[in-house]
Design a protein with these regions (language model features):
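Alpha/beta catalytic cores of nucleotide-metabolism and tRNA/nucleoside-modifying enzymes
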Residues: 1-29, 33-34, 39, 45, ...
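Glycine-rich, positively charged N-terminal anion/phosphate-binding segment
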Residues: 7, 16-23, 38-135
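N-terminal small/glycine-rich loop or linker at the start of catalytic domains
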Residues: 25-32, 91-112, 147-157, 182-198
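Hydrophobic faces of well-ordered beta-strands that scaffold small-molecule active sites
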Residues: 33-37, 83-86, 113-117, 139-141, ...
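Active-site beta-loop-alpha junctions enriched in small/polar residues
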Residues: 38-40, 88-90, 118-120, 146-148, ...
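A structural motif
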Residues: 55, 80, 137-138, 219, ...
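Alpha/beta enzyme core
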Residues: 58, 123-157, 161, 165-251, ...
């Protein structure tokens, strides 16, 4: 895959930049798509698989010539979007928990190392951000205010935290300031973003106040899952909230919720005015969704309709990546849940099974 030289350096004119792009701090997403952080799912192997599908669908002028990072316009270029790690607990990172340290060691082929943090203590969050930035472990840091899982919200974290406005402001401000201070040793300032829901429930809608406070604190973008914490993943995402948020803030807004096919992303951007989309459950067992997203967002009519044989090849590729990352035994255990997702809707028996 080849990348024109002008995409490896600061462009001399706007016409040389990709037309479908969003800026996250100093970084450029040439395709406005983000793989959502998902616990137990978005490890390095799955992120790489999704990115491989996404980059295979890029227009010729955006296809990278090699793996790894692409300096561009004072930051980094992510041709096919952003692929975020699993949620990392700030305290575990500060305490140098071995499993957590493994989670933040990203694939060396990644274009832009994006790590999501979860925590409820501003001081610990600042320390965790400092570690990631000073030790050159991340190029982008996202803060989790969207997790609806009870074991997280019961502690006042995740999607319950924005209701505690003073704590929310302290956490975001601590992260942004820590990133700025630690970035002095880096070639660019590592941006901090947030991901949140519209509120705890219909009686406790928090997203607009939280977004304005986060923007004032200096975040570089805001992702909104258009459901309440109470909804978890039930019902339909209420995209109109994304549009309201976009009109309320000046930083980029990424919409999340009910992106199942490539055309859903196009529709979300058209109906909400959002700058990009975040994809979660829609890609479980369907990493080729990222090829369809790239095709759709760059105006190509091509879509992916894999038969069972093609799906089995994807499973093999996924298994190989996992085996290299965590060893064959753990890879087999990790792959089991993915196989159930992969084979949903297919009649499987005999040799394939």
């Amino acid at each position: 895959m080849s990348l024109p030289q002008n995409l490896s350096a600061t462009p001399s004119s706007p016409s040389e930049t990709p037309s479908h792009q969003v800026k996250i701090g100093p970084h450029t997403l040439a395709t406005p798509v983000e793989l959502a952080p998902m616990a137990g799912v978005t490890n390095a192997s799955f992120r790489r698989l999704c990115r491989e599908f996404a980059e295979s669908a890029l227009p010729e002028q955006l296809r990278p010539a090699s793996s790894g990072q692409i300096p561009y316009d004072g930051g980094l270029l992510a041709p096919a979007g952003l692929f975020v790690t699993e949620m990392v607990t700030t305290r575990a990172l500060v305490e140098r928990n071995p499993k957590t340290l493994q989670m933040v060691r990203t694939d060396p082929t990644e274009r832009l190392r994006s790590i999501q943090l979860y925590g409820v203590d501003p001081n610990v969050t600042a320390q965790a951000v400092g570690i990631l930035v000073r030790e050159n472990l991340a190029d982008h840091i996202d803060l989790n205010f969207g997790c609806p899982v009870p074991k997280v919200t019961r502690k006042g974290g995740g999607s319950a935290l924005p209701w505690k406005r003073d704590l929310f402001k302290s956490l975001v401000n601590a992260a942004v300031q820590a990133a700025k201070a630690a970035s002095e040793s880096r070639d660019f300032e590592v941006p901090v973003t947030i991901k949140m829901r519209i509120g705890i429930d219909d009686d406790h809608i928090t997203y607009l106040d939280s977004a304005r406070e986060a923007e004032d604190a200096g975040v570089s973008a805001i992702a909104l899952h258009a459901r309440t914490a109470q909804q978890h993943y039930s019902g339909s995402a209420q995209w109109d909230y994304i549009g309201t948020l976009k009109r309320a803030v000046s930083v980029p807004v990424l919409g999340n919720g009910d992106i199942w096919v490539g055309d859903d992303a196009v529709n979300m951007l058209a109906t909400t005015g959002a700058d990009g989309v975040v994809v979660g459950r829609g890609c479980q067992g369907r990493p080729w969704l990222f090829a369809d997203l790239v095709h759709a967002l760059h105006g190509s009519p091509e879509r992916t309709h894999p038969d069972l044989a093609a799906v089995l090849e994807v499973i093999r590729r996924h298994a190989d990546l996992l085996s290299d990352e965590i060893g064959p035994d753990r890879a087999i255990r990790d792959l089991r849940k993915h196989i159930g997702w992969y084979l949903k809707g297919y009649s499987v028996g005999g040799e394939a099974r």
